[in-house]
Amino acid sequence: MNITGIQSDWKVEKIEFARLTGERARSAGANGRIGIHGKSCSVDIARITIDGQTGYGSSIHMTPEWAEDIIGRRLLDLFDDRGRLREAYRLQLEYPVFDWLGKRLDKPVYDFVSGAHMERGVPLVVPCYDTSLYFDDLHLPDERSAVALMQEEAMQGYAKGQRHFKIKVGRGGRHMPLWEGTKRDIAIVRGISEVAGPSGKIMIDANNAYNLNLTKEVLEALADVNLYWLEEAFHEDEALYEDLKEWLRQRGQNVLIADGEGLASPHLIEWATRGRVDVLQYDIIWPGFTHWMELGDKLDAHGLRSAPHCYGNAYGIYASGHLSAAVRNFEFVEYDDITIEGMDVSGYRIENGEIHIPATPGFGIVFDDELVTNLVKRSGWS
């Protein structure tokens, strides 16, 4: 990233912290690991003031004592010689700092992080998928009703511009008897593929609720479905992924293997470079945007694909779109339909399975200054 425009006298003057709250458009049910996720969501936000101007962004692992130590530091000193934000400041401040930089430079973030693959001066439009299809059917005793309910949820997304869908599977791993749950997984994926149509891409995510042979059973049953990737079928294991990749190759079934969200194996990237995994999915909030720019360079060099995980953090959804400008083999923005009070994302829009990223300065998200100020006083800190 080019930081030559950062002036040496720009200093951090103030850091404020608040938690904004909101709701999903629809309550989210269970997945293969845990129970109902619900409707409520929150975003921890930092507002940074540098040279009299503010920037907003997601912030984690920040304490008042840590922030106090940053006050008075030069913005330039937060970056290393490569123009990357130093590791010590990333999780706490990378988003508000990048938002501030965009506003000061009068550029969207994607403009000043973009790689050589990006065409300048054209709107940034990025593929996205609806990630809201959880186990909302567990209360229904029969498969037909379950499929109808999940199809209706997919149609809600379709009506809002979504064309690609990720479907939670693994009902038999915890919440239903094994074969009954697996059979329902298959039926629901088939039903939602009808909603998506032949051009819609379908992803399935088991949250590690399958094993190798169960994975093969499901993939064989879905061989005629436009299945794009399989995510977290089981806990990462190179030997099992090698077996699965060879099995898919012998069948001529072109399904990508995706993994990396959560507490992934530290060897996962190494396995991916050896052809065991196709799509890496580390989270956009942790380890974050700058980490992803560095990782994306490495994955691009090996012909691997990037699809940052983002669920439950509304800020990360929109930040992911900007990251696509820095990573050539960026696949999708993971989209969860969330409204956060005081966070205006109306500059973004979804059409035909793509999210249109606004060309406004910073991340293009408008925060309610007065609301944030009140939250800082009432329940946050400065």
Regions found by a protein language model. Give the residues of each.
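Short glycine/serine- and small hydrophobic-enriched flexible loop segments
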Residues: 96-103, 297-298, 321-325
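Short, well-ordered loop/turn and helix-capping segments at boundaries between secondary-structure elements
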Residues: 282, 325-329, 377
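Active-site pocket-lining/capping segments in soluble small-molecule metabolic enzymes
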Residues: 313-314, 318-352, 362
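N-terminal capping/lid subdomain adjacent to the active-site entrance of alpha/beta enzymes
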Residues: 2-202, 209, 216-224, 345-382
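Catalytic core of soluble alpha/beta enzymes
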Residues: 175-317, 350
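Glycine-rich beta-alpha junction loops
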Residues: 19-21, 62, 286, 311-315, ...
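Short glycine/serine/threonine/alanine-rich loop segments
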Residues: 107, 304, 329
